[in-house]
């Protein structure tokens, strides 16, 4: 029977505990031992006080108290050692459980990675990249062909076009010269129209004024 089997009271043929069950059982046992430690410490303190109480008054009782104290201290030391062993076992199982979980996770990741690349190899990748490059070149050639100007009317005589252009330039030059000649002729001078208002009457001569004054003076004398 293994150490764990003896600890949990299981036979050889019985299935061993899972790591979680073992950890839980160890924690429960640790709690029991901790309570035992507290009890032993209290009993040791009581026996120490009893030995002090009897002292020289009752030497026999004092010695008995010290003997009991000594046995309790031995039990406490054994309990401390057992508790340390259980803590070590529990920590070892916890670490093993953690490592096992990490290992399973890494194994799953490796399987997933293997599955992702199971249909791929370097030759297929090179072939795929070559196909992509070829298709890009074809696409570029098509784009260049589409953007190239189409040569409709390439069979037209170039000299004939130049002659027609020269005729158009001559006609345009003739129109410009005619327009310039019209601008150089002086327009007819427009005469001002006769004024519509009447001119003021001219003042009477100076002689008529004198004659009128003399006539007025003669009339006054008579």
UniProtKB/Swiss-Prot annotation:
GO biological process terms held by the UniProt record: late endosome to vacuole transport via multivesicular body sorting pathway; protein transport; vesicle budding from membrane
Keywords, in A-Z order: Coiled coil, Cytoplasmic vesicle, Endosome, Lipid-binding, Membrane, Phosphoprotein, Protein transport, Transport
Sequence segments annotated as region (Disordered): 1-21, 177-222
Record InterPro entries: Snf7_fam
Region feature (Intramolecular interaction with N-terminus): 151-222
Molecular-function annotations in GO: lipid binding
Region (Interaction with phosphoinosides): 1-116
Primary location group: membrane
Topology with respect to the bilayer: Peripheral membrane protein
Coiled-coil segments: 20-105, 155-180
A Gene Ontology cellular-component term: late endosome membrane
Modified residues (Phosphoserine): 196
Subcellular location: Cytoplasmic vesicle membrane; Late endosome membrane
Region (Intramolecular interaction with C-terminus): 1-150
Gene3D superfamilies associated with the record: 6.10.250.1710, ESAT-6-like (1.10.287.1060)
Similarity annotation: Belongs to the SNF7 family.
UniProt comment concerning the protein's domains: The acidic C-terminus and the basic N-termminus are thought to render the protein in a closed, soluble and inactive conformation through an autoinhibitory intramolecular interaction. The open and active conformation, which enables membrane binding and oligomerization, is achieved by interaction with other cellular binding partners, probably including other ESCRT components.
Subunit-structure text: Probable core component of the endosomal sorting required for transport complex III (ESCRT-III). ESCRT-III components are thought to multimerize to form a flat lattice on the perimeter membrane of the endosome. Several assembly forms of ESCRT-III may exist that interact and act sequentially. Self-associates; overexpression leads to the assembly of filaments that curve and associate to create circular rings. Interacts with CHMP2A. Interacts with CHMP3; the interaction requires the release of CHMP4A autoinhibition. Interacts with CHMP4B. Interacts with CHMP4C. Interacts with CHMP6.
Function: Probable core component of the endosomal sorting required for transport complex III (ESCRT-III) which is involved in multivesicular bodies (MVBs) formation and sorting of endosomal cargo proteins into MVBs. MVBs contain intraluminal vesicles (ILVs) that are generated by invagination and scission from the limiting membrane of the endosome and mostly are delivered to lysosomes enabling degradation of membrane proteins, such as stimulated growth factor receptors, lysosomal enzymes and lipids. The MVB pathway appears to require the sequential function of ESCRT-O, -I,-II and -III complexes.
Family matches, as PANTHER family: CHARGED MULTIVESICULAR BODY PROTEIN (PTHR22761), CHARGED MULTIVESICULAR BODY PROTEIN 4A (PTHR22761:SF14)
UniProt protein name: Charged multivesicular body protein 4a
Gene: CHMP4A
């Amino acid at each position: 029977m293994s150490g764990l089997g003896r600890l949990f009271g299981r036979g050889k043929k019985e299935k061993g505990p899972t790591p979680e069950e073992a950890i839980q059982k160890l924690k429960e046992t640790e709690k029991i031992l901790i309570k035992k430690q507290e009890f032993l410490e209290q009993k040791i303190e009581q026996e120490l006080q009893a030995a002090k109480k009897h002292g020289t008054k009752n030497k026999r009782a004092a010695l008995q108290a010290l003997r009991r104290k000594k046995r309790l201290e031995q039990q406490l030391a054994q309990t401390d050692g057992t508790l340390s062993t259980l803590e070590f076992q529990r920590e070892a199982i916890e670490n093993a459980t953690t490592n096992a979980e990490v290992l399973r996770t890494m194994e799953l990741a490796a399987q997933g990675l293997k599955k992702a690349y199971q249909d791929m190899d370097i030759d297929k990748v090179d072939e795929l990249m070559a196909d992509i490059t070829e298709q890009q070149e074809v696409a570029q050639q098509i784009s260049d062909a589409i953007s190239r100007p189409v040569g409709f009317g390439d069979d037209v005589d170039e000299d004939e076009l130049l002659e027609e252009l020269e005729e158009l330039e001559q006609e345009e030059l003739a129109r410009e010269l005619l327009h310039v000649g019209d601008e150089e002729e002086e327009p007819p001078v427009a005469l001002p129209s006769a004024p519509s208002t009447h001119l003021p009457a001219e003042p009477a001569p100076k002689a008529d004024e004198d004659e009128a004054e003399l006539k007025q003076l003669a009339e006054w004398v008579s």
